[in-house]
C-alpha cells in the first residue's frame, strides 16, 4: 500500500490535469516542421509570431484532448485505484482522486480548445485555407479521441489518430 497522493495546488494542479509530461508530443512536431520549412525554403521569412502561436495552439489542443480523455475514462471507470496494488492508474487521476471536479475539467477543456480554435482562425487569416483544414481536423481529433460517436481510443485507433 502506498501513501496517499498529496493534492497539488495552483499551477501544479493544472499542469497535472493537463499532463504536461506529454507536451513533447506536440512541441517536437512543430519544431521539426518549422526547421524543415526554413531549410527547404531558403528565401522564406521565418515568422516567429506564427511559430509561437502554432506551438501554443498545438499544446492547447493536446491539453484539451488529455482533459477530455480523463473525463471519458473516469465516466467509463477506466481511471481508478488498482484495488490489489492500492495505487491509482490512468490519465492524470485528478478527477478520481477528487482534486478537480468534472465541471472544472469540462471548463478547462472548453477553454483550451476555444483558445486553440481562435489561434487557428488567426493563422488561417495569415496562411490560407490549408491551415483551416488542419485546425478543424485537430479540433475534431481532440474531441473524438475518446468522445462518442467515434471514441477512437477504445477501438485501438487512438494511436493512429495521434500519429496523424
Positions of predicted regions on the chain:
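Intramembrane alpha-helical segments
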Residues: 91-164
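Aspartate-rich (DDxxD/NDxxD/DxxxD) Mg2+/diphosphate-binding motifs
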Residues: 65-111
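Topogenic membrane-insertion module of multi-pass membrane proteins
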Residues: 1-49, 53, 57
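Membrane-embedded alpha-helical segments that form the functional core of polytopic membrane enzymes
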Residues: 31, 43-68, 133-137, 141-143
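Juxtamembrane loop-helix boundary motifs flanking transmembrane segments in multi-pass membrane proteins
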Residues: 3-10, 87, 96, 149-152
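Residue-level recognition of specific faces of alpha-helices
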Residues: 14, 70, 159-160
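Transmembrane helix-loop junctions in multipass membrane proteins, especially transporters and channels
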Residues: 38-42, 70, 74-78, 125-129, ...
Amino acid at each position: 500500500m502506498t501513501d496517499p497522493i498529496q493534492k497539488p495546488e495552483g499551477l501544479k494542479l493544472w499542469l497535472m490535469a493537463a499532463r504536461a509530461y506529454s507536451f513533447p508530443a506536440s512541441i517536437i512536431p512543430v519544431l521539426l516542421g518549422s526547421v524543415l520549412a526554413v531549410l527547404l525554403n531558403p528565401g522564406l521569412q521565418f515568422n516567429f509570431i506564427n511559430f509561437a502561436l502554432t506551438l501554443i495552439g498545438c499544446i492547447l489542443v493536446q491539453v484539451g484532448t488529455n482533459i477530455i480523455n480523463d473525463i471519458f475514462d473516469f465516466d467509463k471507470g477506466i481511471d481508478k485505484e488498482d484495488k490489489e496494488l492500492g495505487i491509482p492508474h490512468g490519465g492524470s487521476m485528478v478527477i478520481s482522486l477528487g482534486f478537480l471536479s468534472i465541471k472544472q475539467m469540462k471548463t478547462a477543456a472548453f477553454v483550451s480548445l476555444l483558445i486553440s480554435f481562435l489561434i487557428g482562425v488567426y493563422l488561417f487569416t495569415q496562411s490560407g485555407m490549408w491551415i483551416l483544414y488542419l485546425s478543424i481536423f485537430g479540433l475534431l481529433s481532440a474531441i473524438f479521441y475518446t468522445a462518442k460517436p467515434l471514441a477512437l481510443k477504445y477501438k485501438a485507433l487512438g494511436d493512429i489518430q495521434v500519429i496523424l
